[in-house]
Amino acid sequence: MAKPCETHWKATKQVLIYLKRTVNYGLLYTDVSDVQLAGYSDSDWSGNLDDRKSTSGYSFNIGSGVISWSSKKQPTVYLSSIEAKYKALTSATCEAIWLRRILEDVGTQQKQATRIQCDNQSQLSCHTIQSIMPYPNILSYITFCERKD
């Protein structure tokens, strides 16, 4: 920061106080017999009223513990809710591929497809997307399932 002021100093002190109070906090991951990666993805369509941009996010679990997550405002305005959902699923797919490779590197290869569940009112069926990414043979392991309501 080029010119820190009193507000920055107060914020820094608050962060340090928080860290001091929560130094003994942690996440508990229990031992699971089946290490199956599961993903969840969602996006709101034009959720920001100022610029009409969507926010999308995903999380990935092994057992009951979250191992990866993301939430971010999209850089462009999408024309439909289905476009926003598929862009979110594309990001989640990239993360799933990366996580599967990491799990394989540590000796925990995934034997089944990674399910990425998405709540989507405009599509009421399961899809396997082969054409979004340039490596369709990798995407054969990843199935998108949208919840039927």
Give the predicted meaning of each segment:
Residues M1-D149:
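Divalent metal-binding acidic/histidine catalytic loops
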